From Swiss-Prot:
Organism of origin: Oryctolagus cuniculus (Rabbit)
Residues that hold substrate according to the record: 116
Position of the signal peptide: 1-18
Taxonomic superkingdom: Eukaryota
Record-listed Omega-N-methylarginine modification sites: 139
Subcellular location: Secreted
Record's GO cellular component terms: extracellular space
Protein's name according to its UniProt entry: Retinol-binding protein 4
Source taxonomy: Eukaryota, Metazoa, Chordata, Craniata, Vertebrata
Length: 201
């Protein structure tokens, strides 16, 4: 009889997982996304890392929209090289619009050559423009439509973090992206603020 209960338990676990659709095409994004309201400074509070070398902490992004409505971004943060050399580096991104105003193609590159470069999907999953934003990118799809290599940022307008009610909403969005418990917190300790004493690239 024990094996029967084991099968019942496995079936229950399987049905629980089946309730969440982890295909990238099923993920919802921000309705009627407004680039102009999104522009400005955002501080990365948490990050789900992709494969490759990217900014690791003290990440501050600046989004801007030009007179033609084209969005671009710059980001600065700390990177650790060779396991013991910390430097502050910059990345640049330009965005191409798609039919959905919250979904872009983002071409990005590091000002320093050792950083990753690419042309990824860049989706704004949710934002209230004034407090928080959740960004998502899938770089490689599995055959079943789920994501094999993704990254995601939780941004805040306030470098000191997000209020509790917003944190709860963000956790819900992370679960909807099938990325629950896969984020790490981003430290903001001013490492890249003092340009006179830090390594800059």
């Amino acid at each position: 009889m024990e094996w029967v209960w084991a099968l019942v338990l496995l079936a229950a676990l399987g049905s629980g997982r089946g309730e969440r659709d982890c295909r990238v095409s099923s993920f919802r994004v921000k309705e009627n996304f407004d680039k102009a309201r999104f522009a400005g400074t955002w501080y990365a509070m948490a990050k789900k890392d992709p494969e490759g070398l990217f900014l690791q902490d003290n990440i501050v992004a600046e989004f801007s929209v030009d007179e033609n409505g084209h969005m671009s971004a710059t980001a600065k943060g700390r990177v650790r090289l060779l396991n013991n050399w910390d430097v502050c580096a910059d990345m640049v991104g330009t965005f191409t619009d798609t039919e959905d105003p919250a979904k872009f193609k983002m071409k990005y590159w590091g000002v320093a050559s050792f950083l990753q470069r690419g042309n990824d999907d860049h989706w704004i999953i949710d934002t209230d423009y004034d407090t928080f934003a959740v960004q998502y990118s899938c770089r490689l799809l599995n055959f079943d439509g789920t994501c094999a290599d993704s990254y995601s940022f939780v941004f805040s307008r306030d470098p000191h973090g997000l209020p509790p009610d917003v944190q709860k909403l963000v956790r819900q969005r992370q679960e909807e992206l099938c990325l629950s418990r896969q984020y790490r917190l981003i430290v903001h300790n001013g490492y890249c603020d003092d340009k006179s004493v830090r390594n800059l690239l």
